[in-house]
Regions:
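RNase H-like nuclease fold core
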Residues: 3-98, 103, 208
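Amphipathic alpha-helical interaction segments
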Residues: 7, 207, 211, 234-238
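Short alpha-helical linear motifs
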Residues: 32-36, 147, 255-259
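Basic, amphipathic alpha-helical segments enriched in Lys/Arg and hydrophobic/aromatic residues
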Residues: 218-283
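Short alpha-helical interface patches
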Residues: 10-14, 18-19, 78, 122-132, ...
C-alpha cells in the first residue's frame, strides 16, 4: 500500500471536500439553540496573503455548538456583517453576543439583529486597563488594579451595585488623573460591560470560545500555511464539522453534563437522530 505523504494528503483533502458545509448542517438539521452567542475571529496563515486572515465564528452558549462560520480577509465591519447575516439566514435566534472590544463586531451584529444585547468580555477590557498601568513598578497602580478586579469580580446584582463600588473607587483615587480617566471610560462603556443584566444567563467573558481557540490552535500548528483561500475553507469547514460531531471530554462546572455528548446532539431538531445523520455523512464518501 502506497502511504506517501502526497497520497495521504490527497485522500484526506477529498474526504474533507465531500463534507457538507457547516451552515448546511445547521439549516437542515438544527433548531435548538439558546440564542446567546460567544463570537471571535481566529487567524490563520494562507498562501498569497501578507498577513494572517481570520475565520469568524461563534459558539452557542448552552449547546456549545458552532452554527456557522465565515472566512474573511480581515475583521472589518463588512466581514462581521456577512457573518451575522449568514446566521439570520439560518434562522439562528440570536438574543445576545459576548465579544472582545472590536467595535465592528457590535455594530455589525446590531445591523442584522437590532434588538441584540451586547456584552463586552470583561477579561479583555481589564487587560486593556492593565496595559495602561505600570503594575510592575508602581504599588499604587497595583492597588488600583486590585480595586478594578473587585469591581468586575463575578456578576453584580444590579447597575446600582456596580455604581456603588465604582463610586467608592473614584472617591479613593479622585486626585489621580490617570485613574479618574480609566473610571470615566468604565462608566462610558457601562451598557456593554453590564449587558448580562439585560438578559438571563449571559456570560460576561469569552472564556468558552477562548478554549475552542486553543483547541484549534493545536491543529493549526501542524499546518504552517494553507495553500489557498479555497483550501483553507475546506479544511476549516472539516475541522468545525468534526468538532460538532466529537464528544466533549473536558467540560467543567455547570457544563459537566455535556461530557460524553456532541454539540450537534444538543442542537439538532427532535426529529433528527444521530444514526440517520451518520448515514447521510457516509453517503458523501
Amino acid at each position: 500500500m502506497d502511504l506517501s505523504v502526497g497520497k495521504v494528503y490527497t485522500k484526506c483533502f477529498k474526504v474533507a471536500g465531500n463534507l457538507p458545509h457547516c451552515a448546511d448542517i445547521t439549516r437542515k438539521y438544527c433548531s435548538r439553540y439558546c440564542g446567546i452567542l460567544i463570537v471571535d475571529g481566529k487567524f490563520i496563515s494562507v498562501k498569497g496573503y501578507m498577513k494572517k486572515i481570520p475565520f469568524l465564528y461563534g459558539i452557542d452558549y448552552l449547546t456549545h455548538d458552532i452554527p456557522t462560520y465565515t472566512m474573511a480577509v480581515s475583521e472589518s465591519y463588512r466581514s462581521w456583517f456577512r457573518y451575522f447575516n449568514s446566521l439570520r439566514l439560518l434562522n439562528y435566534p440570536l438574543t445576545a453576543i459576548v465579544c472582545d472590544d472590536n467595535e465592528n463586531i457590535a455594530k455589525a451584529c446590531l445591523g442584522v439583529y437590532p434588538q441584540a444585547i451586547i456584552q463586552l468580555c470583561q477579561n479583555h477590557f481589564k487587560e486593556n486597563i492593565r496595559r495602561s498601568l505600570d503594575l510592575q513598578n508602581d504599588e499604587i497602580h497595583r492597588q488600583f488594579m486590585d480595586e478594578i478586579e473587585d469591581l468586575f469580580r463575578g456578576k453584580r446584582s444590579s447597575e446600582d451595585d456596580f455604581n456603588r463600588v465604582g463610586k467608592r473607587i473614584y472617591q479613593k483615587y479622585a486626585d489621580n488623573q490617570l485613574f479618574v480617566a480609566i473610571l470615566l471610560q468604565i462608566n462610558a462603556r457601562k451598557s456593554v460591560l453590564l449587558g448580562y443584566l439585560k438578559g438571563h444567563g449571559i456570560p460576561c467573558t469569552t472564556n468558552l470560545i477562548e478554549s475552542f481557540n486553543s483547541h484549534f490552535e493545536g491543529r493549526f500548528k501542524s499546518v504552517k500555511e494553507y495553500q489557498s483561500f479555497h483550501h483553507a475553507q475546506i479544511w476549516i469547514n472539516a475541522m468545525i464539522v468534526r468538532r460538532r460531531f466529537k464528544e466533549f471530554t473536558d467540560c467543567e462546572g455547570k457544563f459537566r453534563h455535556l461530557n460524553g455528548k456532541k454539540s450537534f446532539e444538543k442542537s439538532r431538531r427532535p426529529d433528527v437522530d444521530l444514526s440517520t445523520f451518520s448515514d447521510i455523512l457516509r453517503d458523501r464518501f
